[in-house]
């Protein structure tokens, strides 16, 4: 672990709390500022490895929690995991078998970053569209979603896409986001629930 990690307060706090990555601190902050998960919600985590968000979700809800990732996830008590592409119809069928209903979806998935921002952002938007496709198939009407993306020329387009699917949409930049990062979270509440093929406020971390 490089020295920059040793100086990273979010990383140190996550490690001290037993979480698998600093991303756990982001989710805790996001939900504290945007309470979109209820105590009995069934939550689906897309792009869940290494599992830090699953750990946080397990603390927040007594509902069914399922994590999906291309990579294996070490076991977490009370959490089910699926190895596979979350847009794969076979994986969608597996999720349906494990979850009676999906009240919330979280997605912290990110492409492997090349360092070329426009290219990386375009690939992130593709992942966002895939996650929205899953929501349209599985998310219960009135459900909520938290999704990571990256600011860039296509971000407004994505934001408007999400607004077509949810009654309330806002953006949130976590305090624990690294300096210079274009990372931005979309907080979407009250899914309209069309369940068809894919198809207001804006704040920063001080909200």
Swiss-Prot record:
Keywords: Cytoplasm, Methyltransferase, rRNA processing, S-adenosyl-L-methionine, Transferase. GO terms for molecular function: rRNA (uridine-2'-O-)-methyltransferase activity. InterPro entries: RNA_methyltr_RlmE, RNA_MeTrfase_FtsJ_dom, rRNA-MeTfrase_E, SAM-dependent_MTases_sf. S-adenosyl-L-methionine binds at residues 51, 53, 69, 85, 108. It catalyses: uridine(2552) in 23S rRNA + S-adenosyl-L-methionine = 2'-O-methyluridine(2552) in 23S rRNA + S-adenosyl-L-homocysteine + H(+). It comes from the Archaea. Gene3D superfamilies: Vaccinia Virus protein VP39. Its EC number is 2.1.1.166. The active site is at 148 (proton acceptor). It is found in: Cytoplasm. It is an enzyme of class 2 (transferase). The keyword S-adenosyl-L-methionine applies. GO terms for cellular component: cytoplasm. Specifically methylates the uridine in position 2552 of 23S rRNA at the 2'-O position of the ribose in the fully assembled 50S ribosomal subunit. Belongs to the class I-like SAM-binding methyltransferase superfamily. RNA methyltransferase RlmE family. This is Ribosomal RNA large subunit methyltransferase E. The gene is rlmE.
